[in-house]
Amino acid sequence: MLLFLLCLYSMVARGDLGSRSSSHAVHHHHSKEGKNASGMDYGNRSTRNARVKVRLHNHNDDSQDGHHHHKVHRSHGGSIKPHNQKHAKLIRNMIGTHENDPENLTHEEKDLANMAAHGNLDALDMLYRNGSITPDVAESVGGSIPGGITEPVVIQPAESSPMEVNEEARVVDTMSPPDYSDPTGVYVSNGVATGRTNEEQAEINVLNRNENPIDDGIAEEAYSSLLSVGHSLPVAKAVADEIKDANVRKMLRTKRAYDISQPPVNPVYIPQAELARATNSKDVVSDTDRQMFMKKVFEEYIRQGAPVERANFEAGQAGFLIDEYNENLASGLSPDAAYEKAMSLVDLNYQHATRAAAIAGGGQVAAQNAADRSLIEETSANEMVKTPSGLRPEVLKKKEEAINSKKLDRAQDLSSYLTKLHIVEPVNRAHQKLSQAAALKDAASMEGLDNPVVQEKILTDVAASSAEDLAKAHENLENVKTQLKPGGRKTNALNFLSKVLTEKAIKDVNQRNEEMQKEAVKAQKEANENSAVKSAEEHLAKAAEQQIINNEGKSVFSKVLESTGDISEAAKAREEAERAMAETLRHQREARKAEVMKMLGPMGMNSSVKEAVEHMATAHAGLNVVGSDLNELNKKYEEEVAHQSNIEELLRETATSNLEVKEVIPPTTSRVGISEGKIKLPLKGFSNEEPKTEEETIVQSRQRNRRNQVRNKVIGTPVESGLNVVEMEDGYMHISEAAKALKINKGKVFYPESAKGIMEKQKLDTSLLEHKFNTGERAGLDKGVGYYEADASGFTLPLPSPLNPVPTSTMTNEEKSLNIGHAFELEIEDGELIQTPWIEFVKDMRPMVNGRMAHEAEVAAASEMKSRVEEEKKAKNLEGITTEVYTNPDGSKFVEVSSPYGVPEIMTMDQAVESLKSVGSSSVGAVSEEAKKQTPEVPLDMAVTNSVKGSEESFVSSVLSTIQKIGNGKALAKRNAFNGKVDGEKAAIVDEYNKELINEHLSPSSTVEARVRNSIISKAESYARSMGISTQSFLNMISQLPDSSIKEMISYNEAPPSARKDVAETHFYNQIASILPDSKTANTGSVTEMIFNNISTVTHEPNTVGGEILEQMTVPNLKTIEQVETKKTPTGTTQVSVSVPNDPGKIQVLGEVKFKGNPTTTPSSGRRPASNQAVAPANVVPGPMVPSSGRNPLKPGARLPANNGPVSNAPAARIPAGQPDHTMRGFSHSFPNNPQAPGIGATPSPAVGYSGKIAR
């Protein structure tokens, strides 16, 4: 115990305990004096008692008067003279740290010791005489001073104690005195035997004498009184401290009396502290010391101004440290080990509390957690006492569950509190203030409109103010971004770590991609080299073989010529010799091939093996060996053996077997309800790539078979089929290729914590994302991990199909869009799957053959002999068709029919029976005799009739009629694929189909955004053709563009260039980029320009974003110099304007003229232009200089003519005088000397359809 208390004291002296477990135990050093909130500081009693072991005093031992104290002369400094034995002993204790030499004490210490020895009793006596303290206080304080004699006091019942002990349990019966003749006997009170001995009762009576608490105000009054009459500060503090110490001792005696008065503990349960006392009692910290220490900690924190919750928590930590220390002693650990282990647990508690306090902005959550845990621990301890030993593990388990439940509740409360404090409330306040500011701006604008005299000035000031606000907001945003960067003045740690981890992940991915690319290049290079080497080896081998043949021919030629002298005979002999040698070499090569085949026989003889054998026999054996021999090539062919084994293993695997089919979606269903489902993101697409290897062919075939098995079914176990899957409570629903979209009535999208930063870098909207901490609701994430959640209720998610194989990354509703490119899961609480009924989708995938022609073909081929053959073939066909029956939970039965070729079909039981009955040799329904009877006009002898004449045209016409009837024009093309000519009948069907498709997407709304969208949709066919995509794909793309983006583009077009940022940095530009289809000809700039053109058409405002200035001319005028500017617009027209240099208010847009390309006609509005219309195109800068922008923002590569020098004031000589340069919409204009030119004659009227503004 002494070692533990010394450790605590050392930590107090260092000031460590406050930073670890109980920093509250230390405050001021003895040389420091401070003041509390009440004007004084009594110091820390444990520190003071450790510094000055006991108050030194001078008291007459012979005196029996406990209230009379002799005054002794006090000498300050010099030697310390002991006055009695106790005084001498305490002086020795005090100078123990000074090498046992009193002279080593400083003057201050000597003075303090003498004042403590003489002043305390004198001061106490003075306070008692002047009535500052009562007799019981003087008795309590005087009894604590060494040598002091306390007089007997009257025994009183114990009263209220500040130790928070139960009032009823604290009342002890003191009316009946104990029997002192039998100390160990049972104490009897009023005839009732108690559980205490007479000795224990006597101790209780002594402890409860005069235990009324002393008011804390008495110590302060005594402190002030002593200072006011001239006592020194150490004396005043010592007396005040003694009064407070006396109060603590009173409370501890009351606690001791209460502990003794309690009944015996149940013998089956021994408290941990009692067990520790029994095993190692000398080191155990007593309950009294524990309570006193906790109270001191609590008071110290209250004195420092800490809240009550914090003080309670720190006091509890101190008690927890002592409890853990005692418990570790009980487990057999040494005092040092027990202390270290206890401190480690306290450290963990502090780390947890520090994290909670840092998050919550204070210690309230930590204090609440501590209070919850203390209450649970207390309840569990009470249950443990009453529970037999065999059932106590259940109590412990119940306690842990309760603690975990409380922790979870606190975490959820904390998450909600933080979300409200740091997200919801700031955003609401900001939006409220923005609304107020907007209202004030509107009011200022109305003032300008209502007062024509100062209208221009007020509106100019309002516009300037808005521009300044925008610039200031942009500057603030840039400053915040700079501060959040690791190199800025301030770094957000969370963003910093997220950025570092994201950059590291991207770096790792790029590195892996580079490595894979290098490996692929290396493999391709090796393959090319191997192929080149192989070709070179075969070429050299054949060259060597030809050399052998040539040498044989030369040898024979020489011999025959030498023997006969006949050149023709020698030449003939040479040809025969060469032919014989070539045949010999061929036989040898065949023999080598047979040898190699025998060696590689177990591998089989696929194409690659045959090729290798041919190569080996040609180039690596026989007389014409080139490169490696057969032995050196064994390793290469071992790899081929392994490759072949891999293929065989793949072939042996079955696609999917023993599937637990729980439900089948009927083939006629177009809408499927979904509840409590979830889909993994991103969505899977469809690939039409051809397999490049044999393994890829096998895997693709297996996946196709697996899709056929699980499509439109709810499966009990997860199966990888390449289809998108909705995971529900009762199984996994595999979405077919016929699906169109998912409509989410109520649902959420979940993102990883790093997604928001990536989306913000990509300029994507993240306003719907809300940060959460996983408290167990996301099974796939660890507890405590952060993630983002977005409400997807009311959104629609388009699904990929074979016609649109690339999955979209955007969900939309009528107003907003939500990018899900970085999400990992979509949760659907209530939704609907919209799809084309599978029975109709199959018809599109496998068009029906014209029934009439099939019927005629069958009748023409009918005969008795062929009928028998047909029956046999029919049986074989039926054997090749597999069927599987499924029963839904509602009892309905469906049959899946899978033929060797084609797409499996699901049909009802009756439909399946009828269909299989009619299966013939060609898998087309055989014609029954009844059918033959009903069509007698069809002759059986096709050879002697002309009924087949014109059948081709009839067949085509019938097919087109059927297509037109069902409205499926997407399967047709207008042009004949063979001659490139447009087929009128097909074109009409396709046009009708596209027209219906467009009408389905038109909106009945009259808002500007809806009108702009309808304008785009009405031209969908031509736009889609220019982008190289289908009309359906184009319409799907436009339907994903939210109204908010169109509204933003309208505002952007109306804003002056100086007040708007670059197009590529806007939200709408990134939104358009996210919805683009997978097309080589579609780019963000062209689509953006197309939308701005339609905005211009609908709003009758010029397109100020994509215009391109073609030329500028400066011409003289009678009054001033006017500048004529010709500007090409994205609509295919040219806009001409006249302006006065350096006077922006004097600009006249004359009109638009046709330029190269097809113009977009602007309809005449028939109304006056609005006051807020742009005065001139955004990039028209008056003055003789060409505008500095010089670039189309939507076409970065297009530049203006490099004419940046000053323009001469001389008339332009490009156009003859008096001749019109262009024919405009309704009027003409010529430069110069045109009597109708601006400034010379009457002011011209705006052109028909003109939508700009004229300003003079």
From Swiss-Prot:
Signal peptide: 1-15
One BP term from GO: sporulation resulting in formation of a cellular spore
Compositionally biased region (Basic residues): 67-76
Glycosylation sites: N36, N44, N104, N130, N606, N1094
GO cellular component: polar tube
Keywords attached to this entry: Glycoprotein, Signal, Sporulation
Chain segments carrying region Disordered: 18-44, 59-85, 1178-1256
Location(s) in or outside the cell: Spore polar tube
Assembly and binders: Interacts with PTP1 and PTP2.
Described purpose of this protein according to its UniProt entry: Involved in the sporoblast-to-spore polar tube biogenesis. Plays a role in the control of the polar tube extrusion as part of a specific response to ionic stimuli.
Protein's name in the database: Polar tube protein 3
Organism: Encephalitozoon cuniculi (strain GB-M1)
Gene name of the encoded protein: PTP3
